């Protein structure tokens, strides 16, 4: 990662708090993510990971705090501005969100819809250059030979790779991936994480990914941010972060008050 990439802030969250009625889902979470970083939000189900992602793209309005993406304040911008900003924010879902009856190529092309003037009447047609771009993205994820196959005939790992190709077709500045490997076997999980990592390196894209698998986080992330009960427990470079330190977020709150020295108050 170059110094220039490190200097460019793509995402900044300042004391983000989110309540759903009486339930506190996020408690004053702050973080900064730079261009070309792959940052993993790690924690158990209910720790606030997915809620935080949806605060980043404005799907969940924050209760208090501030979210800035690519220079735009998501929490205070007009709705039309936030909708336009979402064109620059790709989202990779746990359950793929593909149209099963469509081919892989047609699903990837959907990622470029925002760049087209939609016809009032008649069928939607894609320019040759867009179709070539979509095939190139499928080739990048290793599925160009399946371009015309229906996505509902693919394995889970293949479907997630199509979903990543669709996200790349969007030409995003930020990619949010919500538990993208939760339903995959270990081999396919590694393939998907490798794709996300290569996107960061080769395209200078920023990826924020939620996971609950410690080994995947340590193996692929530039930084790991641990969440527990809606609070940030640590924010550390993955290099040098031990598995034992990370496992602190899976312990009960009363136990983790006496966490290892690496997670003492000064390191949180």
UniProtKB/Swiss-Prot annotation:
Residues 11-254 form the ABC transporter domain. This is Phosphonates import ATP-binding protein PhnC. NCBIfam families: ABC_phnC. Part of the ABC transporter complex PhnCDE involved in phosphonates import. Responsible for energy coupling to the transport system. GO terms for cellular component: plasma membrane. One of its GO terms (molecular function) is ATP hydrolysis activity. ATP binds at residues 43-50. Keywords: ATP-binding, Cell membrane, Membrane, Nucleotide-binding, Phosphonate transport, Translocase, Transport. The gene is phnC. CDD domains: ABC_PhnC_transporter. Its main location: membrane. Belongs to the ABC transporter superfamily. Phosphonates importer (TC 3.A.1.9.1) family. The keyword Glycosyltransferase does not apply. The keyword Amino-acid biosynthesis does not apply. The complex is composed of two ATP-binding proteins (PhnC), two transmembrane proteins (PhnE) and a solute-binding protein (PhnD). It is found in: Cell membrane. It comes from the Bacteria. SUPFAM superfamilies: P-loop containing nucleoside triphosphate hydrolases. It is an enzyme of class 7 (translocase).
């Amino acid at each position: 990662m170059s110094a220039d990439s490190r200097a460019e802030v793509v995402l900044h969250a300042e004391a983000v708090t989110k309540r759903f009625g009486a339930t506190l889902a996020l408690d004053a979470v702050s973080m900064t993510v730079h261009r070309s970083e792959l940052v993993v939000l790690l924690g158990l189900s209910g720790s606030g990971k997915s809620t935080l992602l949806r605060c980043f793209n404005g799907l969940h309005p924050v209760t208090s705090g501030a979210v800035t993406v690519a220079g735009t304040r998501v929490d205070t911008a007009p709705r039309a501005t936030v909708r336009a900003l979402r064109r620059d924010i790709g989202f990779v879902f746990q359950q793929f969100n593909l149209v099963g009856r469509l081919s892989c190529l047609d699903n990837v092309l959907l990622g470029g819809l925002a760049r087209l003037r939609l016809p009032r009447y008649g069928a939607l047609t894609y320019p040759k250059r867009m179709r070539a771009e979509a095939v190139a993205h499928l080739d990048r994820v290793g599925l160009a030979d399946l371009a015309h196959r229906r996505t509902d005939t693919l394995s889970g790992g293949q479907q997630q790779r199509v979903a990543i190709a669709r996200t790349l077709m969007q030409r995003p500045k930020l990619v949010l991936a919500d538990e993208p490997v939760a339903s995959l076997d270990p081999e396919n999980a590694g393939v998907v994480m490798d794709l996300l990592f290569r996107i960061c390196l080769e395209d200078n894209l920023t990826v924020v990914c939620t996971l609950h698998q410690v080994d995947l986080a340590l193996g692929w992330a530039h930084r790991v941010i641990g969440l527990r009960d809606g609070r940030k427990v640590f924010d550390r470079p993955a290099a040098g972060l031990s598995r034992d330190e990370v496992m602190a977020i899976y312990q009960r709150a009363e136990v983790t008050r006496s966490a290892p020295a690496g997670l003492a108050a000064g390191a949180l």
